[in-house]
Amino acid sequence: MSSNLFNPTRRQLLQGTAALAAAGLVGVRPGFAAAVDWKRFAGTTLDVNLVKSPRSDTLIKYLAEFEELTGIKVNAEATPEQQQRQKTVIELSSGKPSFDVVHLSYHVQKRQFEKGGWLADISGYLADPTLTDPGLVENDFADAGMLFAKDGQGVLRSLPFSVDYWIVYWNKELFEAKGLKYPETFEQLVAAAEALTDPSTNTYGFVARGIKNANTPVWTSLMLGYDMTPLDAQGKLRTTSPEAIEAAGLYQRLMTKSAPPGVTGFNWAEAQSAFLQGKIGMWFDGVGFAPPMENPEKSRVVGKVGYGVMPKGPKAHAAGTFGDGIGVTATSEKKEAAYLFCQWAVSPV
């Protein structure tokens, strides 16, 4: 594939949410074909390291089904993103990680994992009919997912767990109260955010990630609307270009004029939590964070949320695409059993 992961084509930016990156939500045990002996590693115990998110919550919810299917015992740990990343780097760098399966954020950790040689080559497993159900083939995954999952030599190092484009979650009730329509342009986005903001009622028009590092995709996603990517074709930074600076100014305005106090310390979890309370007009983040919106046990905005495409920028209409993977550690002594878990984790509902 000729396109560069860190300088994707417009088609790739606009295309990809989960083919599974298709599968997205893990769930009920699929009707796997008999060619795969799912009991082959019965009695094995796997340790699985996950990022806590709506997807990992769903995965853990259905773990008993995998254990019943395979006879494999799974010890799964799901920790918040920043802590999980620290833990994985420390343990993988030691050469003796405590886990067989690891969840990684492609857009943050792909190069680091490849440089460290931390993930096993699973290309052969995907092609092995005794390990992979015939209903799962490479073409089942979105192109963006495979671009993320393969290293520079085309070796498959993980299975795409998600490929998310970014959207705008918007509170239809708050918009209606102000007589506002969903914004179609960046200019309208700013105007709506400021019109919705009323600190006296603790209501704010916009929220997004503000904490260092996690805030980068917010800025770079806005850059796309100026027809600008962070890197050029030679891999050189374009973050000081006029377009990048203008996008940074837009981001700054949204966060300083329309966002709640303390937003500079927010990651996605804090931004999501704020939106769920019903006092935020718009939240800008990945489509994969949608499930809690309609969960009455977690959300005060059930039935009130709109899921909008990214508004059009001054020069382009685009959405950033980000992905997570799930792979087998290179040092695991249970690689094939661990691969069975990865396969199950990305299986269709």
What does each model-identified segment do?
Residues 1-9, 19-26:
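N-terminal secretory signal peptides
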Residues 32-47, 68, 153-155, 176, ...:
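Immediate post-signal peptide segment of exported/extracytoplasmic ligand-binding proteins
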Residues 34-40, 106-165, 190, 302-306:
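Hinge/lid segment of periplasmic solute-binding proteins
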Residues 42-53, 73-77, 100-101:
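Short, well-ordered beta-strand elements
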Residues 61-141, 173, 177-184, 274, ...:
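Extracytoplasmic "Venus flytrap"/periplasmic binding protein-like
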Residues 111, 217-221, 249-343:
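Extracytoplasmic/periplasmic substrate-binding proteins
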Residues 146-161, 166, 187-237, 280:
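Extracytoplasmic/periplasmic solute-binding protein
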Residues 192-195, 199, 234-264, 310:
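Glycine-centered hinge/linker elements that transmit conformational signals in sensory
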